[in-house]
Amino acid sequence: MRHIILTLLLGSYTLAFAQNKIKGEWYLYELFGKKTSMEMYRLERQTKEKRGYKINFIENKIFIASYFSSSKDDCSPSTRGVYEKINRHYVSFHVDSFSVSGIGCQMNYEGIHADLGKFYIHFPSKGVLYLIKSTGDLDYDKQLAQDAEQINDINSIAKYVFKRNGENISYNPSFKEEVATYVAQVLKLPHYRVCLKFSVGRYTGDVALVKDLETGTYFYVVKDNAAQQEATQKENKYFHFTSEELKK
C-alpha cells in the first residue's frame, strides 16, 4: 500500500514539475494554434527579434498566443485556448478563439473551437522547448524530437526561403505527399523519412524536414513559387537546401 501511495505521489510530482517548466512566456515564429495542421513548434524563452509571436502558458491551464511588435500601429492577431498536461511526455491543446486588434485595424473575433490533439514535450537545452505533434507512438515521437533539433535557426531558414520565394502563404493539404514524390524523383533517396512539416513565419509557407536514412543528412524542402507559376496544374515544383547552405 505504501509503495502504491509513493508511486502516485511521485507521478503527481513529476507531472507538476513538467507543467511548471512549460508555464510562462515563450517566443516562436508562428501564431500558435492558427494553423491546425502544424506538426512542430520551436519555442524560446528569450528573443532578439523586434517582432514576431509569443505564447503565455498561464497558471489556470489557459494559453494566450499573440503577435508582438515594437510598432504600435501593427495589427495584432491572437489565439486563446486551454492546455493540459497528460503526463510527463505529452500536453494537449484546444484553441477556443482567434482575434485581431490594434490601432487602425478592423477588429475581428472568431470562435475556432479546434482540438489540436496532443504534442510531445522536448527540452533539448535550457530555454528551448519543442512541441512535436504526436504520432501515437512514444518511441517515434522521441525520434521526431531528435530530428527537430536540426531546426535550431529558424530565422536563417525563414530568410533563405523568403529570398528565394518571396511571400508564399497558400495552404496545401497534400504538401507532405508531394514532398515525398519530390524526394524520390529529384533527390533520388532510396531510404528517407519526411520527418516534420513546420512553418517559419506568416509569409513563407510550409517547410518539410527530410532525413536521408543512409547518410543521416537532413534536407529542407519548400514549394518553388517561381517554377510553379510556369508549370502546368498537374505539376508540383519544389526546391531543397541543407543546413550547410544556410551558412554560405
Where are the regions a protein language model picked out?
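Bacterial Sec-dependent N-terminal signal peptides
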Residues: 1-22
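Short stretches within intrinsically disordered, low-complexity N-terminal or propeptide regions
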Residues: 18, 147-150, 160, 182, ...
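Lipid interaction determinants
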Residues: 19-78, 90-166, 214, 245-248
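Short, non-transmembrane alpha-helical segments in secretory-pathway proteins
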Residues: 154-195
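Exposed beta-strand-loop-beta-strand "reactive/processing" segments of non-cytosolic proteins
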Residues: 189-228
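A short, surface-exposed interaction/processing loop segment used at functional sites
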Residues: 219-248
